[in-house]
Each structure stands twice: as structure tokens, then as C-alpha cells.
């Protein structure tokens, strides 16, 4: 569930119990390989995240952010099945922000605002991966019968100020406490779908290293993070969304 439905038990049932159902079905049917699109969100949004997250770094999630917490729990479940059912190969992909010609979601709507909002004192940048690179990675993983866990991101990262420059929009650097207060009021008045807990989503973004993707998996993303964003931006402007 990409966007919180407001019914956390329902979302948990879909995300975590649904994954368990798929795993059980794979084991029962003798499936040899399972490809799972997890998320960089499984690492969590934490102030002590390393500058570049490697696949060996801890998956901590955030209990206050259902999407991140459920991704962490799904990954824990996958790890259990890797131990108990080693015959089922798992290829687990952890993408950063996926963008393509037609992407529109909770993240891209941040870029549609007249001005971008940043948390004062936070330098946490964005990493992007082109949706067609995600397709290529899955295709290569299936064709080569690969297993393992890999971050998906284009080369480089972009700060919120760099995104503002590309979009031609100003960036407001607002204290975290003020953003939380504004989101609390806005959410109570149904003026925004964002909630106070999502401040850390902007403040401590997981920045994914793609070293293992390139060196071990053997896939070189066709677009860098900046090229992905420029491609998305051009397509969104054609649709009148930016």
C-alpha cells in the first residue's frame, strides 16, 4: 500500500500478511525464484543513517510511518523464508524514488507545489531510479536466475535546493517543529494527506548506494539521478503537472 489508507490493520494485512501468503504459495508450488520489490524505505528515516546506505546496513524502518514499517517487516519475513526454505531463491530489490514519464504519487506531488519545502538544517538528498531501469533490472534478474538483495538508484544524488533550481522554484527551509504543527492542523482540517510523523520523510531520507547493483549484479543504470529527474520533469510539464 503506497499511501496510508487510514486503516493500518488493513494495510498491514495487505502488505505483510499478503507477502506471507505469496511466500507460502511459492513454497507449496515449488517455485524456484521470487522477485520482490521492497524499498529503500525499509532502512528507515533516521538521523544516524550513513551518508550512503549499503545493502548490509540495518533495516530499521519507522513504526510511525506505515509504509516504511511494513517494508521492514516484509524484509524480516523474507529473511526467515531464506533460512527455512533455501530452495526458493529470492531477488530482493530496494529502489529509491522511482520516476518515469507518467509517475504521479505522494512524492511527486511535493514537486507540484508552487514552492518546495525543506526541513531547516537537513541536507538529506534524493536518489532516483528510472522506471525503465527497474524493468531492466527485473528482466536481467529473471533471465539470469539471480538472487540477493540490491539497492536500485541512479548514480549521484540531488539536494532539495538542486531540485528547486531544476524546477525553477524557490525552496523554503522551515524548522521541523513548525512543519509538524502545520501538518497536524492541515490534516485535522483535511487540507492535506500528510501527517506530522512524515516530517522525517523529508528530513532523513535514506540515500542508497548502487555500488553492489553495478559491481555484483552487473547492471549499470541508464540514467543518473539527475537525468531521471530531468526526464520526469519534462514529461510532467508536457502534461501540465509542473
Regions found by a protein language model. Name each.
Residues 135-194, 210, 230-233, 239-241:
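Mid/C-terminal beta-alpha module of Rossmann-like enzyme folds, strongest
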Residues 131, 159-162, 189-220:
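Conserved C-terminal active-site "lid" loop/helix of NAD(P)H-dependent oxidoreductases
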Amino acid at each position: 500500500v503506497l499511501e496510508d489508507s487510514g486503516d493500518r490493520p488493513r494495510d498491514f494485512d495487505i502488505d505483510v500478511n499478503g507477502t506471507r501468503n505469496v511466500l507460502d504459495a511459492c513454497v507449496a508450488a515449488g517455485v524456484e525464484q521470487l522477485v520482490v520489490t521492497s524499498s529503500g524505505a525499509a532502512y528507515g528515516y533516521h538521523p544516524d543513517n550513513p551518508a550512503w546506505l549499503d545493502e548490509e546496513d540495518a533495516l530499521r524502518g519507522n513504526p510511525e510511518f506505515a509504509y516504511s514499517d511494513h517494508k521492514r517487516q516484509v524484509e524480516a519475513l523474507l529473511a526467515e523464508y531464506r533460512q527455512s526454505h533455501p530452495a526458493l531463491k529470492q531477488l530482493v530489490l530496494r529502489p529509491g524514488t522511482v520516476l518515469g514519464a507518467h509517475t504521479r504519487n505522494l512524492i511527486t506531488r511535493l514537486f507540484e507545489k508552487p514552492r518546495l519545502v525543506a526541513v531547516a538544517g537537513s541536507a538529506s538528498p534524493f536518489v532516483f531510479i528510472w522506471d525503465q531501469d527497474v524493468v531492466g533490472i527485473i528482466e536481467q534478474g529473471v533471465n539470469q536466475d539471480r538472487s540477493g538483495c540490491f539497492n536500485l538508484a541512479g548514480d549521484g544524488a540531488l539536494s532539495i535546493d538542486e531540485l528547486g533550481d531544476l524546477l525553477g522554484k524557490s525552496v523554503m527551509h522551515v524548522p521541523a517543529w513548525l512543519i509538524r504543527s502545520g501538518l497536524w492542523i492541515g490534516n485535522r482540517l483535511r487540507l492535506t494527506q500528510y501527517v506530522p510523523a512524515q516530517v522525517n520523510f523529508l528530513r532523513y531520507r535514506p540515500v542508497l548506494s548502487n555500488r553492489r547493483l553495478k559491481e555484483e549484479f552487473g547492471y549499470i543504470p541508464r540514467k543518473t539521478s539527475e537525468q531521471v529527474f530531468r526526464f520526469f520533469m519534462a514529461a510532467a510539464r508536457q502534461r501540465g503537472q509542473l
